[in-house]
Amino acid sequence: MYGIEYTTVLTFLISVILLNYILKSLTRIMDFIIYRFLFVIVILSPFLNAQNYGINLPITGSMDTPYINSTQEEMFLTSTLCLYYPTEADTEISDNSWKDTLSQLFLTKGWPTGSVYFKDYTDIASFSVDPQLYCDYNLVMMKYDAALQLDMSELADLILNEWLCNPMDITLYYYQQTDEANKWISMGSSCTIKVCPLNTQTLGIGCLTTDTNTFEEVATAEKLAITDVVDGVNHKLSVTTNTCTIRNCKKLGPRENVAVIQVGGSDILDITADPTTAPQTERMMRVNWKKWWQVFYTIVDYVNQIVQVMSKRSRSLNSAAFYYRV
């Protein structure tokens, strides 16, 4: 009886020892396999180019479009795009869902629904006074009008550059421009600007400071006027202050998140002739105009090429900002 019990206990102990040995052996084998596998992965990883799924995948759901194997953030997925267009476009299209249609078309170019905003403006005058360029990227469409050519080119100069501006009290003070980057910017429904250059004795040069009729007229009934006079010379100004506001401004540099698209016209606006435009490049393009649908289709087709020459900026531009810091 006791011999049977001892044999049973001995068999059980041997089984436990054998099982323990087998488990330890399996553990050592698995450790060897895992560590060897990880070692091989570490050695070969610099030479392998594996697709990181979830990065730069087409948001359209299509896997046909080739995407660069990169972990860089796709800017369109986190950026906003604003399109500014004249009200006549909305009137001509006359479709309550045209913006939704364009949003779906922008989606095919990588811009998620809700990232593209459409903003209309009545005319250049109202837009220049209150641009409201709030998006990461801003495309301003201006239909060519020969009668507004000066206003269009000056509006382009205004919104394509950053300006530091201060109020001017022309009733009490004389003003001079210090360098080529220093301009006087006037905005309003009708801006007529006259200037009288002064000598060192504050006497008018070719004009009488007491008679504005003898002043030189540099802008007549314009909605937006950027005035440039001889640097380092004091001037007395006459401005139609009841319909116009004038500011003393300094051009700081390009506003790289704004582009101007001229719609139609045989002449192309060009602001690069200004020596203060540095570098001598501009974010402007012209598209042919027949119908506004055609214009928007063209912009959707080329939106990514346009944005590639721009830079995402966080600083916004509105009427209040313009008067003090643009």
UniProtKB/Swiss-Prot annotation:
GO MF assignments: metal ion binding
Further remark: Some rotavirus strains are neuraminidase-sensitive and require sialic acid to attach to the cell surface. Some rotavirus strains are integrin-dependent. Some rotavirus strains depend on ganglioside for their entry into the host cell. Hsp70 also seems to be involved in the entry of some strains.
Superkingdom, natural source: Viruses
Signal sequence coordinates: 1-50
Positions of Ca(2+) 1 binding: 95, 206, 214, 216
Keywords: Calcium, Capsid protein, Disulfide bond, Glycoprotein, Host endoplasmic reticulum, Host-virus interaction, Metal-binding, Outer capsid protein, Signal, T=13 icosahedral capsid protein, Virion
Glycosylated residues (UniProt): 69
Subcellular localization: Virion; Host endoplasmic reticulum lumen
Region: GPR motif, residue numbers: 253-255
Lineage of producing organism: Viruses, Riboviria, Orthornavirae, Duplornaviricota, Resentoviricetes
Record-stated family: Belongs to the rotavirus VP7 family.
Database matches in InterPro entries: VP7, VP7_1, VP7_2
Binding-site list for Ca(2+) 2: 177, 228-229, 231, 301
GO cellular component, one term: viral outer capsid
Subunit record text: Homotrimer; disulfide-linked. 2 Ca(2+) ions bound at each subunit interface in the trimer hold the trimer together. Interacts with the intermediate capsid protein VP6. Interacts with the outer capsid protein VP5*.
Function, in words: Calcium-binding protein that interacts with rotavirus cell receptors once the initial attachment by VP4 has been achieved. Rotavirus attachment and entry into the host cell probably involves multiple sequential contacts between the outer capsid proteins VP4 and VP7, and the cell receptors. Following entry into the host cell, low intracellular or intravesicular Ca(2+) concentration probably causes the calcium-stabilized VP7 trimers to dissociate from the virion. This step is probably necessary for the membrane-disrupting entry step and the release of VP4, which is locked onto the virion by VP7.
Organism: Rotavirus A (isolate RVA/Pig/Australia/AT/1976/G3P9[7]) (RV-A)
Chain intervals for the UniProt region annotation (CNP motif): 165-167
Protein name: Outer capsid glycoprotein VP7
Mod. after translation: N-glycosylated. The N-terminus is blocked possibly by pyroglutamic acid.
Disulphide connectivity of cysteines: 82-135, 165-249, 191-244, 196-207
Pfam families linked to this entry: VP7
